[in-house]
Amino acid sequence: MRLPLLVSAGVLLVALLPCPPCRALLSRGPVPGARQAPQHPQPLDFFQPPPQSEQPQQPQARPVLLRMGEEYFLRLGNLNKSPAAPLSPASSLLAGGSGSRPSPEQATANFFRVLLQQLLLPRRSLDSPAALAERGARNALGGHQEAPERERRSEEPPISLDLTFHLLREVLEMARAEQLAQQAHSNRKLMEIIGK
């Protein structure tokens, strides 16, 4: 009893204790060809511009991890290439510059715009016009083998809940009657044995 408790407590402690940050995120590394004194690594903030050094560096895009439905997209810099997000004026300005980086405000605006868009997407029912059009396009692309099965399903009337519960009640009554018949048979046998 104590061993599983101790093991589960240990697993929870390991899972919940803060771990040291990833070294790849701590520093960008030395600039090639330049000698630098050893520095203490500082965590990076993806929405803040990196500190500028004396020598010019190539601009690097910062990744933003964004959850879209059940898939994760890794976007570098701006999020205007997201399939679910239309181009906003801020993101179209970002795409215009060849080596320009998005400002922190634009990056956060893009992130939250796409996140809100995903949260506010209407849930489509199976009989909505958009869902019917999507199914029609899928059938036109190669779902012809499902047509006979779908026709067969549409011919059968749907089973209502009342009918389902009625059938369940009848099955339970039949089982109860069979159990009573078996009990009566065993009682008869017992009475025959005792009566002899």
Swiss-Prot record:
Name one matching Pfam family: CRF
- According to the UniProt entry, which residue ranges have a biased composition of type Low complexity? 38-47, 85-104
Give the signal sequence positions.
1-24
Q: Per UniProt, what does mutating N187A do? A: No effect on affinity for CRFR1
Query: Localized where?
Result: Secreted
Note the effect listed for P30R. Found in patients with autosomal dominant nocturnal frontal lobe epilepsy; uncertain significance; results in decreased protein levels; decreased protein secretion
Which Gene Ontology cellular-component terms appear in the entry? extracellular region; extracellular space; neuronal dense core vesicle lumen; perikaryon; synapse; varicosity
Gene3D superfamilies, sorted: 6.10.250.1920
Question: Which residues belong to the propeptide?
Answer: 25-153
Ranges of Basic and acidic residues composition bias in the record: 146-156
Tell me where it mainly resides: secreted
Functional summary from the UniProt entry: Hormone regulating the release of corticotropin from pituitary gland. Induces NLRP6 in intestinal epithelial cells, hence may influence gut microbiota profile.
Question: How would you summarize the oligomeric state and partners of this protein?
Answer: Interacts (via C-terminus) with CRFR1 (via N-terminal extracellular domain).
Q: Indicate what this protein is called per its UniProt record.
A: Corticoliberin
Gene, per the UniProt record: CRH
